[in-house]
Regions:
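PAPS-dependent sulfotransferase catalytic core
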Residues: 1-94, 219, 295-297, 302
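The conserved 3'-phosphoadenosine-5'-phosphosulfate
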Residues: 46-53, 179-244
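C-terminal lobe/tail of nucleotide-utilizing enzymes
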Residues: 221-274
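A structural signal for well-ordered alpha-helical scaffolds and beta->alpha junctions
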Residues: 27, 55-59, 89, 93, ...
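PAPS-dependent sulfotransferase catalytic domain
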Residues: 75, 97-213
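Residue-level signal for short amphipathic helical patches enriched in basic/charged
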Residues: 25, 128-131, 307-310
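Boundary detector for helix-to-coil junctions that initiate low-complexity/charged tails
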Residues: 252-328
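A polyampholytic, Gly/Pro-enriched intrinsically disordered region
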Residues: 66-70, 155-165, 232-241
Length: 328
């Protein structure tokens, strides 16, 4: 993220900081750092889960508002969609106004984090013209892989939809940032991890947002990137528009993290043939391991049944020995 020139505007607690980005893009990590530094993200937050054991840091009121509007538009509540227009019913607009009024009255620097906000950026911008936005993105192949690991029905039946959703969210993010440069700060997930202090400095310089120092409690095991080097190459070949969108976001954020295979933005020819067969081989090895695991499980089940049968026979013999004489 490029640090903008310092603003003469004093910090205003009534101006919220809204954190959003595509699901599985590091928004929870970013929100946890902001909350630890003093940003009030809500009184009732979504509980931790297996996917986010340290917490989601999502305001339940804002979350339920987004879910309700999505369902009203015929979209799954998770927000997995590429629908270009999402209408907010009039009654829900009044609910949004009430949500904002309640949170503004709490005092201190406030805001919220909720990935689905990305689908409603124009709506919230109209309702909160002074809001500030911290927009985070993550490498598309990492997000897609993370979604697959969650084993959700949406992507299990249509895997390619995962990259479509990533593209839809991040296109909305990029378009909004370009239309509202004074109100937005864009960063890559890797910058949140490696340049946390610089990110906080940028927030202070651009938005006048004064927070405490970021807490150093990042757990690398919760944000691993141990993926096949073939994935970004295959994604670039199959979905060049999505890869180019990622490069545009990197440029806007001033990200300097290494690109796959050490290639610069001006990419060279792809060794697609080698990567296709690499992934084919990996998939075959995975299938063989699954078959071996199934074989071992079946053998263990058979052995367990035999043990249980033997145990039953032993108990029956024991009962016969201790049965009182004369008993029927």
């Amino acid at each position: 993220m490029r640090t903008a020139p310092e603003t003469s505007e004093k910090p205003e607690a009534r101006r919220p900081l809204i954190v959003c980005g595509m699901h599985r893009s590091g928004t929870s990590l970013l929100a946890s750092l902001l909350a630890a530094a003093g940003l009030r993200l809500g009184d009732e937050l979504l509980e931790a889960s297996a996917g986010n054991p340290r917490g989601h840091f999502e305001d339940l009121g804002i979350l339920e508002f987004h879910r309700t509007v999505l369902v009203a538009n015929g979209i799954v509540s998770e927000g997995y969609t590429t629908q270009p227009v999402i209408a907010v019913p009039e009654a829900m607009q009044r609910e949004a106004e009430a949500l904002v009024a309640t949170r503004q009255s709490g005092g201190g620097s406030w805001g919220w984090k909720e990935p689905r906000t990305t689908l409603f950026l124009d709506f919230w911008s109209g309702l909160l013209p002074d809001a500030r936005y911290l927009l985070v993105f993550r490498r598309p192949w990492e997000v897609v892989d993370s979604l697959f690991h969650r084993n959700e029905t949406t992507f299990r039946h249509n895997p390619a939809f995962a990259i479509d959703v990533w593209t839809h969210y991040n296109r909305a993010l990029l378009d909004f940032a370009r239309r509202h440069p004074e109100a937005t700060l864009v960063c890559e997930a890797t910058q949140v991890i490696t340049d946390t202090e610089r990110l906080f400095d940028a927030l202070a310089a651009k938005f006048g947002l004064s927070l405490g120092k970021p807490a150093a409690h990042y757990d690398e095991t919760l944000f691993h990137e141990d993926l096949s080097p073939s994935l970004p190459v295959l994604l670039e070949a199959a979905c060049p528009a999505s890869y180019d969108l990622y490069l545009e976001l990197r440029e806007l954020a001033g990200s300097t993290s290494p690109l796959p295979d050490g290639r610069a933005a001006g990419r060279g020819p792809l060794d697609l043939r080698g990567h296709v067969f690499t992934e084919w081989g990996r998939a075959t090895q995975h299938m063989l391991r699954c078959h071996e695991a199934e074989r071992r499980t079946a053998a263990l089940d058979k052995r367990l049944m035999k043990i249980e049968a033997t145990r039953g026979e032993r108990w029956l013999r024991l009962l016969r020995r201790v049965r009182p004489r004369g008993a029927a």
